[in-house]
Regions:
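Positively charged n-region of N-terminal signal peptides that target proteins for export
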Residues: 1-5
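Cytosolic catalytic domains that perform sulfur/thiol-centered chemistry
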Residues: 19-245
Length: 245
């Protein structure tokens, strides 16, 4: 019995050390080379979540057409609110179901992979990242450049459907990651507080708008900061840290 307990203890220690080593260079934004190296060392080092549609007519637009080996399909549409208000955060029950379907726990390293055709695809990945963080997950990252960057780097691609064992993680919405209408309204009257409108400039100016929007325009007092500015030439890759600063 003592020998068995000793072996279990050693295995636990080895697993913990390996896990800590894998996360020693973990960061919220991973390059394709960094993710590939991580998965080469251990295919189970991170849960890779592909948020593209399962099927699509356009080449490379769908999970079934090809994905990062081991990646799990979790289409972006499932992370959005109802059609009349897609920007609204999903219910806690749905959030729990989505997280458990990934087989994820609170400390599971998760990498979100978007299509990678334009900067707007990164926005979809950021929405899922935010949702997972709001659910209570702590080790999260987005693949810089998305699936297109992975493919263009000539890295392995699989067409095998991954079906992980569901977890029993009890997702709890962390309210400090959400801003309610009343809170935003209160902040608008406080000195030193800025509300940034990261939508396209045409949305801010009221020249165009989402079909679900009740009216064109922006929040009174908001500052325009089109999120396209963060990306290199309007593509899917974030600018260098030096330029972002």
């Amino acid at each position: 019995m003592k020998l068995r307990l000793l072996l279990i203890g050693l295995l636990t220690l080895i697993t913990s050390v390996t896990f800590a080593s894998e996360l020693s260079h973990w960061k919220p934004l991973l390059s394709v080379d960094e993710l590939h190296e991580l998965l080469e060392e251990d295919p189970f080092a991170a849960t890779v979540v592909d948020i593209r549609a399962l099927d699509a007519k356009e080449p490379d637009a769908s999970y079934n057409a090809g994905h990062i080996p081991g990646a799990i399909s979790s289409p972006y549409a499932t992370w959005r609110g109802q059609p009349d208000n897609p920007g609204k955060f999903i219910t806690q029950d749905k959030l729990t179901w989505l997280v458990q379907a990934l087989g994820a726990e609170a400390d599971t390293p998760v990498v979100v992979v978007h299509r990678g055709d334009s900067y707007s695809d990164f926005g979809a990945a950021a929405r899922v990242y935010w949702s997972l963080k709001t659910a209570g997950l702590t080790n999260l990252a987005i693949l810089n450049g998305g699936f297109q960057a992975w493919k263009q780097a000539g890295l392995p691609i699989s067409t095998e459907l991954e079906t992980p064992l569901p977890s029993d993680f009890p997702a709890q919405i962390q309210p400090h990651w959400l801003a309610q209408t009343a809170e935003v309204e209160a902040y608008l009257n406080k000195p030193g507080v800025e509300v940034l409108d990261a939508r396209p400039d045409s949305f801010f100016a009221g020249l165009s708008w989402h079909p679900a929007a009740s009216k064109p325009g922006t929040i009174a007092g908001a500052v325009a900061f089109d999120n396209e500015r963060w990306f290199h030439s309007g593509g899917p890759l974030l600018e260098s840290p030096e330029r972002l600063q």
